[in-house]
Amino acid sequence: MCGIIGINSNKEVTSTILNSLRKLEYRGYDSAGIATLNSGYIQEVKCEGRVDNLEKNIIKNKLLGNLGIGHVRWATHGIPSTLNAHPHSSDNVSVVHNGIIENSTLLKKFLVKKGHRFKSVSYTHLTLPTSRS
């Protein structure tokens, strides 16, 4: 289970996403994360634990942006960790996900043969290589 929020605005969205994640925290408190688009670059801050921990990291990393996604996670696959926390990002895309990718083992084997490397055991990480053009 998890909680997901996304916002696109002409104003800074980080604090709004953070406040929304606080309201969604009952859906997952094992890890939390936010990714924003700022000046054409994806910035990502994640942590193990509750949204309060995430807020400290956001302040430390000065996360800003007018487009962003956030996620709180209840770990059902993979241990609670910063590495397994969402969002998962590449250079040009950031993804959050709720649920199970049924053919994840087969998909991962296929992508590893193609040379892809994975940082986490989260199902969501499998979608990043396939989203690149």
Where are these regions (language model features)?
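Ser/Thr-glycine-rich phosphate-binding loops at phosphate-binding pockets of nucleotides
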Residues: 72, 123-124
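Conserved glycine-bearing catalytic or ligand-binding loops at nucleotide- and phosphate-handling centers
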Residues: 116-122
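N-terminal glutamine amidotransferase
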Residues: 1-105, 109-113
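Conserved small/polar residues in nucleotide/adenosyl-binding loops
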Residues: 124-130
